Amino acid sequence: MKISGLRSSYEKVGGIVFFGRTLDKIRLHAQGKLPADYNRGTGFDSRCTRFLKVEYPALVERTLQGGTDEEILEWCFQKGHRPGEEEILVWNAFMTKRGWRDDVSGWLAQEKKKRGFAHRDDIQTAFDFHKADEAED
């Protein structure tokens, strides 16, 4: 299902994948525009906040105060952890491959089947699944 205002998992803020999507989910939920089945604060959102070493509720509070994505990311760096270039490289590689030959592969196969994508060999990762699922109207 296409959701206006929800960016791709692949899009980067400050070089970091998924962070912008987490912010979008926070904002959309506050506006009542995020479907209930979108995990908030768990799954990849939780991984992202753990990577930055900030608590999800604190990120929600800061995001809803306003500011650009870059300002909120800088807040995360100040309150939590500013990852180095190599850490970001490893994070991005890890996240963009989730679902491909790992512990998320079973979940991905189930979700593909539920959404009618079982035949889609191009969907090999969770990020690919998000992209395909959200392209559907």
Where are these regions (language model features)?
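Polar/charged low-complexity regulatory segments
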Residues: 1-36, 94-137
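Amphipathic alpha-helical packing elements
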Residues: 34-77
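Amphipathic protein-protein interaction modules
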Residues: 59-115
